[in-house]
């Protein structure tokens, strides 16, 4: 019965499988599952090929560096640093990645190779720290004295018995300088000679030009000596005498320079010969000319007397040229008083200017013949 029961179960399983396959095929699920399985198989095969052909993880530059003695020494120092501080996880990554699981030297061998003597100061730290300290000491060596340049190796100049350095170097420098100067002087002798000739010719041209200039200046100075005489003559520096003093009509006291009165305020001189319009010409005989002039003088003196100017026939003509009047006696009066007198005189002149316009004239009277021999129009 057991066998029959097993056969019945097998038949039922087969029927169930067939029914399941048929159902999955009808629904399309079985075909999709087959396609996915097929794709997964292909992908697995392709990835397997890539993994087989993949290059190994090897750092070529690091491999070359570690093949040298210094490279292995550096790697040993780093490994010793990690071992000293018990950095096991970092060391577990460092050794496989650098392929230094074997062959790195220990602390004692490193100290011997680097020349480091194990002492109390070095035991308290890794060897890498001691290497850095020694490098810093070498850098500071020239200033601290270690590794500095030995100045005794440099040969100093010999010293005299008194302890002073001799000056043998300075003569050699002087000799070199003299040799250089001689060479330059020889090389520059030819251009200097040419330049000197050019300068001499140029100087001669300039000298001739200057001599011509000086001769021309002397000729010009000789051609116009009158101008120099006129400039140097003191006669032209003297002030022009005032009309009243020269003509003898009215004499006033000498005015100080800078006084308020000026020649512009003096009465105008008009129609100097208005009263002598009917006089005969000067080419007539002396008797006729003297008679007419005397008549005119008498007429002028009469008019002046009628105006009260104080000049009559009895006045001496010499006093007019000496510029003496009733104010000449006050020459020692102060400047302030003279200014006041000048102002008063100017006021009087303004009042009498209209009366003197027709009487202004210039007469030169001969004291011997009492006859005017020269007449001049002042206007």
Swiss-Prot record:
Keyword Iron: no
Protein name: Centrosomal protein 43
Chief location: cytoplasm
Compositional bias of kind Low complexity: 185-196, 266-282
Composition bias, Acidic residues: 225-236
Family: Belongs to the CEP43 family.
GO cellular component terms given for this protein: cell projection; centriole; centrosome; cytoplasm
Intracellular or extracellular location(s): Cytoplasm, Cytoskeleton, Microtubule organizing center, Centrosome; Cytoplasm, Cytoskeleton, Microtubule organizing center, Centrosome, Centriole; Cytoplasm, Cytoskeleton, Cilium basal body
One example of a Gene Ontology biological process annotation: microtubule anchoring
Segments forming domain LisH: 70-102
Biased composition (Basic and acidic residues): 239-255
Annotated stretches, region: Disordered: 139-196, 216-288
Chain positions found as Phosphotyrosine: 317
Record InterPro entries: FOP_dimerisation-dom_N, LisH
Task of the protein: Required for anchoring microtubules to the centrosomes. Required for ciliation.
PROSITE patterns linked: LISH (PS50896)
Domain of life according to the entry: Eukaryota
Modified residue annotations for Phosphothreonine: 143, 170, 214
């Amino acid at each position: 019965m057991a066998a029959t029961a097993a056969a019945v179960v097998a038949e039922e399983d087969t029927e169930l499988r067939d029914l399941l396959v048929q159902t999955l095929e009808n629904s399309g699920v079985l075909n999709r599952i087959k396609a996915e399985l097929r794709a997964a198989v292909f992908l697995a095969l392709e990835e397997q090929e890539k993994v087989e052909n993949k290059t190994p993880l090897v750092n070529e530059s690091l491999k070359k560096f570690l093949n040298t003695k210094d490279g292995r020494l550096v790697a040993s120092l780093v490994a010793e640093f990690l071992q000293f501080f018990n950095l096991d996880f970092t060391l577990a990554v460092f050794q496989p990645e650098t392929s230094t699981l074997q062959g790195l030297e220990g602390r004692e061998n490193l100290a011997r190779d680097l020349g480091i003597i194990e002492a109390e100061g070095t035991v308290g730290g890794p060897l890498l720290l001691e290497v850095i300290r020694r490098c810093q000491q070498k850098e500071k060596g020239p200033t601290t004295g270690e590794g500095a340049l030995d100045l005794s190796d440099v040969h100093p100049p010999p010293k005299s018995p008194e302890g002073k350095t001799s000056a043998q170097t300075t003569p050699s420098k002087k000799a070199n300088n003299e040799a250089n100067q001689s060479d330059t002087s020889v090389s520059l002798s030819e251009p200097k000679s040419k330049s000197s000739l050019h300068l001499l010719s140029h100087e001669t041209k300039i000298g001739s030009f200057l001599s011509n200039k000086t001769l021309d200046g002397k000729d010009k100075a000789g051609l116009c000596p009158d101008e120099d005489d006129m400039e140097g003559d003191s006669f032209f520096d003297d002030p022009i005498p005032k009309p009243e003093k020269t003509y003898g009509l009215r004499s006033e006291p000498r005015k100080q320079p800078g006084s308020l009165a000026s020649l512009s305020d003096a009465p105008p001189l008009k129609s100097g010969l208005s009263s002598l319009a009917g006089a005969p010409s000067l080419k007539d005989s002396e008797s006729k000319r003297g008679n007419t002039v005397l008549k005119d003088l008498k007429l002028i003196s009469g008019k002046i007397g009628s105006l009260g100017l104080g000049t009559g026939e009895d006045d001496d003509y010499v006093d007019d040229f000496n510029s003496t009047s009733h104010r000449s006696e006050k020459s020692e009066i102060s400047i302030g008083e003279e200014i006041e007198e000048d102002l008063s005189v100017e006021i009087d002149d303004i009042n009498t200017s209209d009366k003197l316009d027709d009487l202004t004239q210039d007469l030169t009277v001969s004291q011997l013949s009492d006859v005017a021999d020269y007449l001049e129009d002042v206007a």
